[in-house]
Amino acid sequence: MEANVTIPIWQNKPHGAARSVVRRIGTNLPLKPCPRASFETLPNISDLCLRDVPPVPTLADIAWIAADEEETYARVRSDTRPLRHTWKPSPLIVMQRNASVPNLRGSEERLLALKKPALPALSRTTELQDELSHLRSQIAKIVAADAASASLTPDFLSPGSSNVSSPLPCFGSSFHSTTSFVISDITEETEIEVPELPSVPLLCSASPECCKPEHKATCSSSEEDDCVSLSKASSFADMMGILKDFHRMKQSQDLSRSSLKEEDPAVLISEVLRRKFALKEEDISRKGN
């Protein structure tokens, strides 16, 4: 009977490590006190700034810093600034403040760079437009020179013709009507003003007797032919390469492009420029490889 009797722990004899549950836990798990909160005093604080406020920070200081409006340099209530608009933070404080703020300017610049068009494509477009305008002016000069050579014949200035009495300003007005030739573009419909042809003053300076009515009868047909050939040579000299490209392109046109108008100079110009820049890109890619 005595062996089956249960003895409660509080009636057990207090000896050794079994006399207290707290001591038993303490032997296996030593408990250390939490570190106390420590406050660091700010250097270079004058006694005038302290005033009646205690220098020891409290929970009120934490609330005051949280309620401060965008002042990351605020520390405690004792750090008062009577003249707020004249106070300037030190460079070290500014560096700490800038380091704590994320750099959003770099991400904005990247987004703007993605939205903007690529610079190589823009420069290529401007080059195409410049070359197209140059070709327009050259073709307009050729057409004007052809019209002038067709109207300027030996019969026009011959002594026995009926047109001897006609004044030269009429010829200038017809020249002005021919120089207003404009080629329509596929991409843009703006008209480009063609500069005046240098063949008109060249013609008048080469044969000043032809410009005067009283000396028209003395101008021979050989001098007229020389003047016309000189003006035509000056206008056609710089267009031989372009006309050769046009001729090659007309010969190598596919049957699928039969719907396009072969007489349209804008289509021919755009095709020549497209092939020219395609060859340039192939050469650049080969050099890079």
Swiss-Prot record:
The modification Phosphothreonine is found at T27. Phosphorylated by AMPK. Upon stress, phosphorylation by AMPK is sufficient to induce mitochondrial fragmentation. InterPro entries: Mtfr1. The modification Phosphoserine is found at S38, S100, S107, S221, S222, S235, S258, S270. It is found in: Mitochondrion outer membrane. It comes from the Eukaryota. GO terms for cellular component: mitochondrial outer membrane; mitochondrion. Keywords: Membrane, Mitochondrion, Mitochondrion outer membrane, Phosphoprotein. GO terms for biological process: aerobic respiration; mitochondrial fission. It is a peripheral membrane protein. The keyword Mitochondrion applies. Mitochondrial protein required for adaptation of miochondrial dynamics to metabolic changes. Regulates mitochondrial morphology at steady state and mediates AMPK-dependent stress-induced mitochondrial fragmentation via the control of OPA1 levels. Belongs to the MTFR1 family. This is Mitochondrial fission regulator 1-like. It comes from Bos taurus (Bovine).
